[in-house]
């Protein structure tokens, strides 16, 4: 596709998520008076986000300009690309563009959240062209761990703005996983103005091991297992799940799934023909014990840390459905993120202690779903962009990707390292980063959207680490006396029976503070409560070196 004939004036590129982090992808591209959203993903909470279910990007800037939004363009069906779509559509109206599988998964998300809203869905593929007033938009097939992944190409009068989505190059894959390198080369020859590209594995040298080689080595490893085999992987890694199904069929083992997160997406993809499953291969998890141990494979799946958590429970004999037994073999088909490394190491120790054999996870038997250094350079060389923006990674990964782009020939001054909310402006002459819009995290707790802030998280940390200390007093303000109490209650702070002296001392301190407040000309309840918080906190810290949350409760008769 050649450049559009209309001369564009202004272009703005704004990351609202997916930079400085591996998740929550969302990038805004504005061409004159039209706005396009590239991916709308979520992030699963970090350890310190106590009680938070998911995190989505702050879209206040989009809401302020919602009349300009022409569509949400999705690269693939993983949660960090589509997980925020239903939350976005609750707040505005916009058509949604994606591959057949991606659109099906979005519809399922909307149904699961009981959002009954008429949405315009457009199924697109490698040959689709969407025409707008200022731009045309086309797509190209990429390889990721889920079928029908796409890159997005916004054609402007200056050249194409290409968003790769999450990708790798693997020419051993075919069908729904095959990359269309010919189409990419055509886009590169037509002229790429800006390349926005995946940085997740920008620090990993070389190439990923081809998936056909991975499957061969997995077969060799699994064939040596004499007992029950448990494979732990993410529910979203359809390539790995298909490989396990293939190997199980060759080894005459039945397969059972353990984990609720897989059910809906797997069943949707299965009905649409994305999985090749031999007849009678799958059995319910409740029937596993009906087969000899050397005739079954259990695939423990889930999102984020769920598969590892399930293994930990199984190792400790705390799982509701099944537990690790002597002679079991376990394979973790998971690429550990930084915050998961310690958890995985601890879980492996628990599994070994429970009698399991661990099949080593190495480059021969496991590959990332993101391109390594040489694959990233290959994309840059194919596209030959004038400007380059590394995204989808921690900041150090973005920096590593920027260095690769410079090595591949992109002028260093035309490489932009961006953070959430940064605005890259192009006015027809210069590309500059000189502006910022509102951005950040929206924390979702249950059905509450954005009503959990830093203060609430701080309080949850306090409760989790140091517990809670409640002082209850009933007052007779008319006669200026304590009618009942003080009564002290604590949870998660100290073992009451071993700390009776400390609690009695705290009661006396509360009595002293309240009686002093009752002697004032004007009784100030807020001041009495604050004095209780300050002085009790000081007393408890001096005795225990801990600071529980202090809650004074004062009632009147």
Swiss-Prot record:
MF terms (GO), sorted A to Z: 5'-3' RNA exonuclease activity; RNA binding; RNA endonuclease activity; zinc ion binding
Keywords, in A-Z order: Cytoplasm, Endonuclease, Exonuclease, Hydrolase, Metal-binding, mRNA processing, Nuclease, RNA-binding, rRNA processing, Zinc
Any Pfam family hit: RMMBL
InterPro entries: Metallo-B-lactamas (IPR001279), RibonucZ/Hydroxyglut_hydro (IPR036866), RMMBL (IPR011108), RNase_J (IPR004613), RNase_J_2 (IPR042173), RNase_J_b_CASP (IPR055132), RNase_J_bac (IPR030854), RNase_J_C (IPR041636)
Localisation: Cytoplasm
Claim: Chaperone is one of the keywords in the record: no
Name by which UniProt lists this protein: Ribonuclease J 2
